[in-house]
Amino acid sequence: MGLRIHFVVDPHGWCCMGLIVFVWLYNIVIIPKIVLFPHYEEGHIPGILIIIFYGISIFCLVALVRASLTDPGRLPENPKIPHAERELWELCNKCNLMRPKRSHHCSRCGHCVRRMDHHCPWINNCVGEDNHWLFLQLCFYTELLTCYALMFSFCHYYYFLPLKKRNLDLFVVRHELAIMRLAAFMGITMLVGITGLFYTQLIGIITDTTSIEKMSNCCEEISRPRKPWQQTFSEVFGTRWKILWFIPFRQRQPLRVPYHFANHV
């Protein structure tokens, strides 16, 4: 199933996403320029570490772009409701359209989204049934890339041997300390924020509960898993092959699951 393009016109979301792209570009340029390539040239680190760094960076960027542009599960104006599932649908009191239960109307986007988790300004898009898996990959690779960059920043000053060849004519070399301090500040800030977000997302999937459902307290026991964790993750990622859960380049094939909780509606 191909991914439908979904573009949200929201200046606030553009600014938030632009900030994320800036942090990504800053680290993808500064860390290799100051740390990776100089230490590789002097034999302090193997080249595979540079390949891994760029690999994680590419996966992170692909997940960001696809999570931002993929239709999260917007409902059509005249959906075809299977006769056997009519009791699982309800009328939205904001847009007056029929929708599956567990859908939610996003006031910022102006339409209902299937199994909507929340609207995320950092990707300028809703997180719903069709792009939740990409959002999880974005959280994972952002955290991995941040840890990788912070680790090399620490090793650059406290573990690696001092560099013998330094071109002081380069701007990044003359102002290395200030540049690396800014990179460390952004990295620590990003790591703290993304760790909390990633944790809540994982708990939500394990308990089969969206963020909106948690906030509205519509579930009696949101902390008790109602399905095996392998099943809930497979439903989100659209495959039971765990290795594919980490690949942002593929297309998601949704598993046939109902849009409701057994005891939540």
From Swiss-Prot:
The chain crosses the membrane at residues 17-37, 45-65, 134-154, 186-206. The active site is at C120. Keywords: Acyltransferase, Cell membrane, Golgi apparatus, Lipoprotein, Membrane, Palmitate, Transferase, Transmembrane, Transmembrane helix. It catalyses: L-cysteinyl-[protein] + hexadecanoyl-CoA = S-hexadecanoyl-L-cysteinyl-[protein] + CoA. GO terms for molecular function: palmitoyltransferase activity; protein-cysteine S-palmitoyltransferase activity. InterPro entries: Palmitoyltrfase_DHHC (IPR001594), PFA4/ZDH16/20/ERF2-like (IPR039859). Belongs to the DHHC palmitoyltransferase family. This is Palmitoyltransferase ZDHHC21. The gene is Zdhhc21.
